[in-house]
């Protein structure tokens, strides 16, 4: 099932060795000084986890600082990773993510590239043609169904970091199997 595949793949990714930057605390402090505010303790913990884990879930209600935390993570990733993808399940959510973070975001379907030549929904990026990203940040995770997330994980490189962002109390996925 899709759920079992997702659990297995996230488990594989989570066990891949990772190392957080030795200067992480000072990097966070420099970011705070540059932006003119301090992160809340839970935001700092989320930032630390994003740089020390392969798989992370960042969840919270509206106005809890998820986007601010994602922006901090993106800023810190810039010096480490060349290929970071931001995506969301809908065009509207991807556009909003681009506006709020200043980084280009796409839909998950666009990231995976739909292959229209087959007559059914297949993706160009899959387990045989992996996505080129070191990090994939998925926003509005509550709206992502199990099949789409399964396809994304199958196309992710074996050492990719996956950050899932969302609000469990928001709109559920239209398709079966709400991931968040």
Outline where the language-model segments fall.
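Conserved ATP-binding/catalytic motifs of P-loop helicase motor domains
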Residues: 1-180
């Amino acid at each position: 099932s899709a759920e079992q595949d997702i659990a297995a793949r996230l488990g594989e990714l989570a066990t891949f060795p990772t190392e957080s930057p030795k200067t992480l605390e000072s990097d966070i402090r420099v970011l705070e000084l540059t932006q003119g505010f301090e992160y809340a303790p839970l935001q700092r913990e989320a930032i630390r986890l994003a740089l020390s884990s392969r798989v992370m879930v960042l969840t919270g209600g509206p106005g809890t600082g998820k986007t601010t935390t994602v922006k901090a993570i993106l800023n810190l990733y810039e010096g480490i990773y060349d290929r970071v993808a931001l995506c969301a399940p809908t065009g509207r959510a991807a556009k909003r993510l681009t506006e709020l973070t200043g980084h280009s975001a796409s839909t998950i379907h666009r990231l995976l590239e739909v292959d229209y030549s087959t007559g059914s929904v297949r993706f160009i990026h899959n387990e045989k043609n992996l996505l080129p990203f070191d990090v994939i940040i998925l926003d509005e995770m509550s709206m992502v169904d199990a099949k789409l997330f399964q396809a994304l994980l199958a196309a992710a490189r074996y050492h990719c970091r996956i950050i899932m962002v969302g609000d469990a109390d928001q709109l559920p996925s239209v398709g079966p199997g709400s991931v968040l």
